[in-house]
């Protein structure tokens, strides 16, 4: 594409997700992917792994290398939290709704909701992985300058 066609879009520089148990193995599940435009908001459903599960551990990670990897050890845990003291009576496979969002400020917000709770677990972390408004404006100015000089 020529410079005339270029646009500056703020994107996520690394992927983010949660560690989930898949086929009895901890797996890094990406919800936000590298180069997704910001703001971004993604919702995915996960499920409890046992009847009467009383705790849900939420581990949020950042992509550790150039490529997405499902191996937890290839990624960097940013923040952890738990939904605790869940009452008995919920079967294996009870839905947990996970929402992950990031604005142009690079702040990642993750909520995890189990039906037994009125309020979701909320985790917030400053990632530094998005350009701020001043950086986006500077990039736009640079592209506009190139366009004018063609």
Which residues does each predicted region cover?
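Acidic low-complexity intrinsically disordered segments
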Residues: 1-150
């Amino acid at each position: 594409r020529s410079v005339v066609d270029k646009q500056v879009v703020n994107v996520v520089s690394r992927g983010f997700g949660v560690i989930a148990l898949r086929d009895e193995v901890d797996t890094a599940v990406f919800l936000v992917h590298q180069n997704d435009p910001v703001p971004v908001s993604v919702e995915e459903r996960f499920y409890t792994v046992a009847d009467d599960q009383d705790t849900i551990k939420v581990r949020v990670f950042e992509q550790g290398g150039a490529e997405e990897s499902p191996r937890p050890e290839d990624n960097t845990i940013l923040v952890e939290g738990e939904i605790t003291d869940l009452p008995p009576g919920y079967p294996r496979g009870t839905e947990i709704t996970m929402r992950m969002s990031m604005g142009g400020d690079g702040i990642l917000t993750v909520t995890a909701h189990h039906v037994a709770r009125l309020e979701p677990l909320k985790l917030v972390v400053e990632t530094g992985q998005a350009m701020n408004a001043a950086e986006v404006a500077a990039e736009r100015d640079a592209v506009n300058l190139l366009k004018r000089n063609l």
